[in-house]
UniProtKB/Swiss-Prot annotation:
GO terms for molecular function: acyltransferase activity, transferring groups other than amino-acyl groups. InterPro entries: Acyl_CoA_acyltransferase, GNAT_dom, YlbP. It holds the Pfam family Acetyltransf_1. The lineage of its organism: Bacteria, Bacillati, Bacillota, Bacilli, Bacillales. It comes from Oceanobacillus iheyensis (strain DSM 14371 / CIP 107618 / JCM 11309 / KCTC 3954 / HTE831). Keywords: Acyltransferase, Transferase. SUPFAM superfamilies: Acyl-CoA N-acyltransferases (Nat). Its EC number is 2.3.1.-. It is an enzyme of class 2 (transferase). Residues 9-151 form the N-acetyltransferase domain. This is Uncharacterized N-acetyltransferase OB1458.
């Protein structure tokens, strides 16, 4: 996976067109088009969307949001963390390491990461070093989040 570059995707109509390919292949719950449409403002605004291009084609993408320390109910010590949403690789490019490249890019920020895996993807996330967060009904609201803990960080004990 040398020379594979993760790019911050611009929030514009050109990116919206590229996202349409994912809607053709993916599940409705993974589509980021609505997210992008809601974020189309200026080309230079900070985009939460990241992707990998193969030639001129966007072949893999994810959303990565930074959550402020004041809303941290997952990690000890409390700190800013990342929420990784909607990681998706087009079918022709799956099982070639592109998803791993995106996750490793997120890990490079050296912040804890939370994700809510979809579509039988737990095996992938476990391979990437994510663990199941202890379920807390009020916090998790029916989701089953997985978390990644960088060195020196542990899961918050919600009982205390």
């Amino acid at each position: 996976m040398e020379n594979v570059k993760v790019e911050n995707l611009l929030i514009n109509y050109k990116t919206l067109e590229k996202f349409k390919r994912f809607r053709e292949y993916g599940n409705q719950e993974l589509t980021m088009m609505e997210d992008l449409e809601n974020n189309i403002i200026e080309n230079d605004s900070k985009s939460p969307f990241y992707g990998i291009y193969f030639g001129n084609n966007l072949i893999a993408r994810m959303s990565l949001y930074e959550v402020s320390k004041q809303y941290d109910y997952y990690f000890e010590p409390s700190q800013d963390y990342l929420t990784l949403w909607k990681l998706e690789v087009l079918p022709d490019y799956q099982n070639k390491g592109y998803g791993e490249v995106l996750v490793n890019f997120a890990k490079s920020f050296e912040l804890p990461i939370k994700t809510n895996p979809r579509i039988n993807s737990h095996g992938f996330w476990e391979k990437m070093g994510f663990i199941k967060a202890h379920y807390e009904m009020e916090r998790d609201l029916g989701e089953n989040p997985l978390i990644w803990l960088p060195e020196g960080v542990k899961e918050k004990d919600m009982k205390s």
